[in-house]
Amino acid sequence: MIGIEEKDMIINRIPAKTWNHLHMNQSRVGEVVINRTGELNASVNDVSLIDDGKLNNGELNNIIGGCGQEITEAARKSQTEPVYYITDKKNAGFVRLDFNYGRNNADINVVGIETKENASIDVYMDFNGDKDGEGFAAVQTRLYAAKDSVIRLIQIQRVGSETTFINDIGGYCEDGARIELVPVSYTHLRAHETRSNL
């Protein structure tokens, strides 16, 4: 079993100006033992899976997400297997990623998405877990949008209320490019009536 123990990992180091607005600037996650790569089912359409992760000459790996360097280091030490997708097509369709978390797991996933110049893609990420789960789950998503390209990221969060869930996103846009983020919270869905039919 591969594992990494983190004690008092500090995430989301936000500067003082943000503290003045939100009245929060960081959180501590105490004693996490990450013991596996999270279960991930992928459906792709007209998108390439890159095995070595060397998108854009490695620039994707230099993007820091909102949770800061500590979650990046935890992912590296856990030796989780990243997945990377790339497209050079306009309206390439979608990548759908379904994350399934168990009741007491301690999982982490690393995902990279890159669009080439003038390309566009929709990425659906569905985080689903046991409603009575009390585990830990983290997902680190890195996005690189080349010139005049578009990445649309739609995330649905359906993990249990007692699960510690870290959603770390970082992105970089070249000239004329954009990244659109559409979060959908479990609390905005009537869970007993809602199915994921994206």
Region roles according to the model:
Residues 10, 18, 59-63, 75:
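Generic structural signal of hydrophobic/aromatic residues within well-ordered alpha-helices
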Residues 51, 62-190, 195-196:
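Conserved beta-strand/loop scaffold segments within soluble protein domains that form the structured core
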Residues 18-21, 26, 42, 46, ...:
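N-terminal cationic leader/targeting segments used for protein routing and processing
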